[in-house]
């Protein structure tokens, strides 16, 4: 059952590997929803939790995603609190199931190595459009 929660109430429960799903309201996001027939326009992966913020001495969550944010485009790591505060659309937290968490824990070194290799890659607009075409293909 989906339940709406404030970010500050759930942030401490997030763990690396959890999925954050976004459903934007921009023109591009609405087009993506139409062509993919999905409420989700892109996803991010929680990479690190409880990383100390040197300015406030508090902890925060980081996510990795392929997006356009703060004038940059591509695969990047962002503070989840900043994404939540500035995102125009819906956001869902999808924690890993117990079985998936167990598999993740057994393979997390390879997972993180793969993810860090993706950081900084450019946004692949052609692949994005190709994905949308695949979604509407009836074959």
Regions picked out by a protein language model, each given a short descriptive name:
Residues 1-5:
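Short, structured beta-strand/loop micro-motifs enriched in basic residues and often containing a Trp
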Residues 16-20:
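Loop/turn positions that initiate beta-strands
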Residues 22-103:
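Glycine-rich catalytic cores of cysteine/serine-nucleophile enzymes that process amide/ester linkages
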Residues 15, 58, 121:
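Structured loop/turn residues at beta-strand edges in well-structured enzyme cores
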Residues 8-13, 35-37:
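Short, surface-exposed secondary-structure edge patches
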Residues 28-34, 88-139:
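Active-site nucleophile-His-acid catalytic modules used for acyl/amide transfer and hydrolysis
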Residues 13, 83, 114-118:
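Residues that form generic nucleotide/phosphate-binding pockets
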Residues 15, 38-41, 109:
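A structural signal for well-ordered alpha-helical segments within the folded catalytic domains
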């Amino acid at each position: 059952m989906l339940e709406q929660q404030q970010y500050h109430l759930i942030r401490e429960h997030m763990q690396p590997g959890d999925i954050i799903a976004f459903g934007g309201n921009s023109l591009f996001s609405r087009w993506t929803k139409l062509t993919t027939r999905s409420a989700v326009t892109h996803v991010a992966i929680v990479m690190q939790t409880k990383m100390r913020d040197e300015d406030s001495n508090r902890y925060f969550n980081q996510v990795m995603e392929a997006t356009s944010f703060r004038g940059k485009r591509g695969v990047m790591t962002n503070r989840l609190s900043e994404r939540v505060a500035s995102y125009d659309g819906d956001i869902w937290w999808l924690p890993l199931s117990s079985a998936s968490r167990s598999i993740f824990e057994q393979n997390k070194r390879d997972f993180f190595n793969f993810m860090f290799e993706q950081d900084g890659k450019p946004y692949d607009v052609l692949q994005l459009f190709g994905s949308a075409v695949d979604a509407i293909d009836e074959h």
